[in-house]
């Protein structure tokens, strides 16, 4: 899929991986890049505009933990402004297993709520045009970092939720896939808390192993968006992009 003249809404598009991905996206000659994030970063927005002045870059403050009704209201404003949204990227995430409720609220519930809200506009059963959802998971959604089971569990939930969305595409007209970064050098992983402090040095130990840069991750992130494969589970690790085949151990039969 060419991203030329597409309208993309990027939740958390100013974070570590998020900002580098936004930089790559504007190079693709989008029509609009709408960034929703908790904290404004005028310098980053100005940089994105300077990279490609042909792309309209807009920022709206957004906390993914707000009720669905508030998200729907914000999306209504965005649709009124740019008329169509082609791709929604759900990228909000925190890594801190001391904050159990917030980890689940940001990493999973917020993603589900944002998705639910945009279906109000996209669902073909309501006359909508359909759309594409790219959800950011993590390799911990396949195999946990067991010292951070809350974070890992939230990312496993993202993978399963998104796989379900993909199978619902014939009904809703909305396709979906996950991009799942491996350990990436961002502020997220430099220091974080394990669950019940089971491993106080978890961040330090993790960074002893091979990692990738956020730029490497961002480049493969955008490649995955361009490949636009419904139901794909993409692994973005050590500068590579790989489609994961999920092993089926059970089937509902419906």
Swiss-Prot record:
Quaternary structure, from the entry: Homodimer.
Family: Belongs to the short-chain dehydrogenases/reductases (SDR) family.
Highest taxon listed in the record's lineage: Eukaryota
Gene: Adh
EC number: 1.1.1.1
Enzyme type, top EC level: oxidoreductase
InterPro entries attached to this UniProt entry: ADH_Drosophila-type, NAD(P)-bd_dom_sf, Sc_DH/Rdtase_CS, SDR_fam
Keyword NAD belongs to the record: yes
Name of this protein: Alcohol dehydrogenase
Residue sites binding NAD(+) per the record: 10-33
GO CC terms of this entry: cytosol
């Amino acid at each position: 899929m060419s991203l030329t003249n597409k309208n993309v809404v990027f939740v958390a598009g100013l974070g570590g991986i998020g900002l580098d991905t936004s930089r790559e996206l504007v190079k693709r000659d989008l029509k609009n890049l709408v960034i929703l994030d908790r904290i404004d970063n005028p310098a980053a927005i100005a940089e994105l505009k300077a990279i490609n002045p042909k792309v309209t870059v807009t920022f709206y403050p957004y906390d993914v933990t707000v009720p669905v009704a508030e998200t729907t209201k914000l999306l209504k404003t965005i649709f009124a402004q740019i008329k169509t949204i082609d791709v929604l990227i759900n990228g909000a995430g925190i890594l801190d297993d001391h904050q159990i409720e917030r980890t689940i609220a940001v990493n999973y519930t917020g993603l589900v709520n944002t998705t639910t809200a945009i279906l109000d506009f996209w669902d073909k059963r309501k006359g909508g045009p359909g759309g594409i959802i790219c959800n950011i998971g993590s390799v911990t959604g396949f195999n946990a970092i067991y010292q951070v089971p809350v974070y890992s569990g939230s990312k496993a939930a993202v993978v399963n939720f998104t796989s379900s969305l993909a199978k619902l595409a014939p009904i809703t007209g909305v396709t979906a896939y996950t991009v799942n970064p491996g350990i990436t050098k961002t502020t997220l992983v430099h220091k974080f808390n394990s669950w019940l402090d089971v491993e106080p040095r978890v961040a330090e130990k993790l960074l002893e192993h091979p990692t990738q840069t956020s730029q490497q991750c961002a480049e493969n992130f955008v490649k995955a968006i361009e490949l636009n494969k419904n139901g794909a589970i993409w692994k973005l690790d050590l500068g590579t992009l790989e489609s994961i085949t999920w092993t089926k151990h059970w089937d509902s039969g419906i």
